[in-house]
Amino acid sequence: MSADLLSLFTATFVTFFVLIDALGVAPVFATLTAGGDAAYRRRMAVKSIIVATIIIYGFAFGGSWLLGAMHISIDAFRAAGGILLFMIALDMVFEKRTERREHRAEEHLGTHSADPEPDDISVFPLGIPMVAGPGSIATAMFYMSDKSDWIEKGVVLSAIGLNLLLTLVIFLIA
């Protein structure tokens, strides 16, 4: 593996590790699945990662086409994505992102705690937007639109996939 590909993998992995924030989402996952048994927790973890994988990879491959169909240039989307990533970074610095996630989890539990059967939370709120949020979707599109070589695209996709696999492991442990 060349140094350029290793650098690309590392940059992509670190970027998605911060964006997906598996360690920050794990307590929310644990809270949202607290009412279910081990099989329910495992099912929600696997389904949420499958949903997030489909969404992120779908936008990584088809996002540029979708933007073109809506007459939005990739540069305009990059500018909006940069602003979004900056806002996420500010939230992380001031710990507001974690507070919002915890608030959503408490709100969800408060409205659904009387249900005898736990809800299917794998698509919303876990798969989308907690794992496959706007930041990770936009970043996947950016990384894939910059790469013309399929080897580089494979490196980007493998770094994203490793992050999603790591998120699954963290969910299963939580």
Task: Locate each region found by the language model.
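Membrane-interface helix termini and inter-helical loops of multi-pass transporters
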Residues: 2-3, 64-73, 140-153
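Structural signature of hydrophobic alpha-helical transmembrane segments
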Residues: 8-25, 74-83, 154-167
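Juxtamembrane transmembrane-helix termini in multi-pass membrane transport proteins
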Residues: 6-60
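Membrane helix-loop-helix hairpins that form the core translocation module of multi-pass transporters
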Residues: 39-102
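Generic transmembrane alpha-helix signature in multi-pass membrane proteins
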Residues: 17, 26-33, 124-129, 136-146
